[in-house]
């Protein structure tokens, strides 16, 4: 019986490349010339620092654009609501969603079961295992998961026939 796992992970290498490209773009941008702004990546958290709140939001947009170019889904970003003001700079922390939370996993299982596909779905820690009789059923589940608006990107691995 074919089976697969639905997971939510961020490719660490591509994320680092996106941050490096963002830093390169930041150095070349005219609106940031002469301003104190930086993008730093450490321990799976990106810290954006700028002289005002508007510039922090622009840094988020730069990072989002570079992540899209590197095929890292921007939906995995978890940006702070408010910029922290310290001294003469504002800073934002951007964390990345890893693993499928229990609540999101339950919604995904319900979505798959409501679709009336002939598959078995089970939650296994931070991933969801889908087993079916036909490979086509699993491909329909993949399409369903991609179309779902659960606020988190999904990847599919461990595909077995």
Swiss-Prot record:
Pfam families: DUF520 (PF04461)
The protein's name: Nucleotide-binding protein Spea_3114
Record has Nucleotide-binding as a keyword: yes
Record InterPro entries: DUF520, UPF0234-like_C, UPF0234_N, YajQ-like_sf
Function summary: Nucleotide-binding protein.
Residue spans crossing the bilayer: none
PANTHER family for the chain: UPF0234 PROTEIN YAJQ
This protein's UniProt keywords: Nucleotide-binding
GO molecular function, one term: nucleotide binding
Family: Belongs to the YajQ family.
HAMAP family named in the record: YajQ
Gene Ontology CC annotation, any one: cytosol
